[in-house]
């Protein structure tokens, strides 16, 4: 048995930021299914939204709701927007290097669905810049232990209270984790379930499956975002390469097989995706074209160096020709149902990031709200855990010895003898849950 105060599953931006906002006198165990740099947070290209000033509040709020088809939780949206400046200040304090204008002011870009430029960025690798910086700050903390290539297999709970987890360690052995305070699920989305996805393949919705297994409430499981533009390939690949929405925000256009523009590129993602699929069907093609030559060359060079290089490796010169793009699964709006402090319906269990759903995105996420939402509500989870730890919201619970005894009593090694079967079962549980939500919604 591994003992800790707080157990965080996942080392993406939400898990890392949560850890940074927890007390330094708490022992924190973090695990990640792959290595610490293989989280989808690293893959976010476009940027992170921020409320530039109060005059932008109404339009930012409306843009978020419009993209979400007005099914968003309005309080969640308000919290996210109102907290954005605080989060950005934290990130800059940690050392995140956002782009600046020539006069030293923060530079903003625009993406689909936004009525104004309000997105901060670092070249076309904003997620990597943020997540790598947060990881470096976490690695400086003596109270945090990170175990790589360690997967959460199950939680240990009784009477709707979580006491620990079951993990598969790097050497393939099974162990248990018992925690004194709380557990945080920050284990990403479900892209690994799809043939074409921008996500890492190991992200298969383990947290969602565990929630289904233990009766933890879920929300909007069928709300799955398809990104309009990933680089087309006729060969099998680990994941689809994203062509950031900010490329279109800077002026790139979408073209049909006759090299004619066929849609407004700055509509919300689901609308642009539908337009592309319709055009592909009309043209009888497996992709449409995206032309970056409408953007000044210096902007492309400075803002999108990673995209330029990846396209070059694939045989495309974005300066002289359009590139083929196709929609692919990208983001999971649904998840484990949480309140505005990221608490699930099970005691001692929190969920943040793409694993969680507080309704902030509605049916369809507005571009560059994902990193922000993950950070805002991860910090709120940490603050709630802090408050509970000092007794501000204390609920009578078993003492540490009793908690350990409960974990030992409930853990049955024979239940985890066939891990490959468990993994397959979990995948099917998530897919079945998606179908169930669709049926209940009449889709």
Regions found by a protein language model. Name each.
Residues 1-4, 13, 21, 27, ...:
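Glycine- and aromatic-enriched mobile tails/lids
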Residues 2-4, 172-182, 345-346:
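Core beta-strand elements of the Rossmann-like FAD/NAD(P) dinucleotide-binding domain
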Residues 36, 210, 216-316, 384:
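An anion/pyrophosphate-binding glycine-rich loop and adjacent beta-alpha core
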Residues 49-80:
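Glycine-rich active-site loop/strand segments that organize a redox cofactor
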Residues 74-85, 118-136, 147, 198-205, ...:
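Short beta-strand to alpha-helix junction loop
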Residues 94-174, 186, 230-234, 254:
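Conserved redox-cofactor binding core of oxidoreductases
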Residues 147-148, 153-168, 303-357:
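A glycine-rich dinucleotide-binding beta-alpha-beta segment and adjacent secondary-structure elements
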Residues 182-235, 241, 371, 375:
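Glycine-rich loop(s) and the adjacent beta-strand/alpha-helix scaffold that form part
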């Amino acid at each position: 048995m591994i003992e800790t105060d707080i157990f965080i599953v996942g080392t993406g931006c939400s898990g890392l930021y949560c850890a940074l906002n927890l007390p330094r006198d708490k022992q924190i165990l973090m695990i990640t299914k792959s290595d610490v740099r293989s989280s989808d947070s690293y893959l976010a290209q476009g940027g992170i939204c921020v409320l530039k000033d109060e005059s932008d509040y109404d339009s930012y709020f409306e843009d978020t709701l419009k993209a979400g088809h007005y099914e968003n939780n309005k309080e969640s949206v308000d919290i996210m927007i109102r907290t954005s400046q605080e989060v950005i200040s934290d990130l800059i304090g940690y050392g995140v290097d956002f782009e600046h204008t020539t006069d030293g002011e923060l530079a903003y870009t625009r993406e689909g669905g936004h009525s104004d430029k309000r997105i901060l960025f670092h070249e076309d690798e904003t997620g990597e810049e943020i997540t790598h910086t947060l990881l470096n700050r976490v690695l400086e903390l003596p109270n945090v232990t990170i175990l790589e290539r360690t997967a959460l297999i199950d939680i240990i709970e009784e009477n709707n209270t979580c006491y620990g987890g079951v993990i598969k360690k790097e050497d393939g052995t099974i162990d248990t984790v018992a925690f004194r305070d709380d557990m945080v699920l920050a284990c990403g989305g479900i892209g690994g379930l799809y043939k074409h996805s921008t996500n890492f393949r190991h992200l298969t919705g383990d947290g969602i499956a565990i929630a289904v297994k233990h009766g933890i409430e879920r929300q909007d499981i069928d709300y799955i975002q398809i990104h309009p533009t990933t680089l087309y390939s006729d060969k099998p690949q680990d994941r689809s390469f994203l062509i950031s929405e900010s490329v279109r925000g800077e002026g790139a256009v979408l073209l049909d097989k006759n090299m004619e523009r066929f849609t407004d590129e700055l509509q919300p993602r689901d609308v642009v995706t539908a337009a592309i699929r319709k055009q592909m069907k009309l043209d009888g093609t497996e992709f449409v074209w995206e032309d970056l030559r409408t953007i000044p060359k210096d902007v492309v060079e400075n803002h999108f160096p990673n995209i330029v290089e990846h396209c070059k490796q694939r045989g495309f010169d974005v300066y002289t020709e359009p590139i083929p793009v196709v929609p692919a699964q990208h983001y999971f709006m649904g998840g484990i149902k949480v309140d505005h402090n990221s608490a699930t319906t099970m005691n001692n269990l929190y969920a943040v990031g793409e694993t969680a759903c507080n309704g902030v995105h509605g049916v369809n996420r507005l571009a560059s709200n994902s990193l922000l939402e993950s950070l805002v509500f991860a910090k709120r989870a940490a603050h709630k855990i802090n408050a509970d730890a000092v007794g501000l919201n204390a609920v009578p619970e078993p003492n540490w010895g009793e908690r350990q005894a409960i974990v030992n009593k409930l853990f049955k090694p024979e239940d985890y003898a066939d891990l490959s079967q468990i993994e397959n079962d979990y995948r099917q549980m998530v897919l079945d849950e998606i179908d169930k939500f669709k049926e209940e919604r009449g889709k």
